[in-house]
Amino acid sequence: GFFDKRMMLEQSSRMPFVIRYPKDLPQGTRNESLLMNIDIPALLLDYAQVKRPEQMQGESFRSLLKDDKLEGRPYTYYRYWEHSPDRPAHFGIRSSRYKLIHYYGKPLGMKSANAQATPPSWEFYDLETDPNELKNVFNEPSYQDLIVEMHASLINEKAFYEDHQTPVPDLE
């Protein structure tokens, strides 16, 4: 079965984040912006009025907490590298509605990864029509333009986060 937060599934990647700071945030404030765990330290530094180190990849989302009309990240990037046949290594991006995942299925010399490779594959989910991610629509014609667009964004996100270990393959 699945355990941990290893797979790029909504049940794993969606996490509540609760913060109490009455001086700045009204009680009951809710925000549905896309965030990544690397943004949390940047937020805490922002509230502590400490300059974010240049090498820190995360961004403070303080302004998003105060104004839900502001737009945050268009995508979140995810990478799982500890490959095994039942939990293949993969990376992907998620927008507010869609998710594109590539299972590259190779251990890439990682110490704790299983050496047995798995066939590479793609998955694409429309989280509005399929919130439980039960129907992979990667091969459906009506989604192809969006998949091509998200594929280009996946390449950009990997580069931005300096994840160069395995390239994003062409869509197949």
Predicted segments with their positions:
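Histidine-centered active-site microenvironments of extracellular/periplasmic hydrolases
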Residues: 1-29, 36
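A glycine-rich phosphate-binding loop feature that marks nucleotide/adenosyl-phosphate handling sites
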Residues: 170-171
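Intrinsically disordered, low-complexity polar regions and short flexible loop motifs
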Residues: 130
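Active-site rim elements
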Residues: 4, 24-34, 47-52, 84-87, ...
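C-terminal cap/loop subdomain of S1 sulfatases and analogous C-terminal strand-loop tails that border
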Residues: 38-41, 46-123, 127, 145, ...
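Conserved beta-strand positions that form and line the central face of beta-propeller blades
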Residues: 7-8, 17, 30, 60-63, ...
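Short acidic-hydrophobic sequence patches enriched in Asp/Glu that either
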Residues: 7-13, 33-36, 53, 57, ...
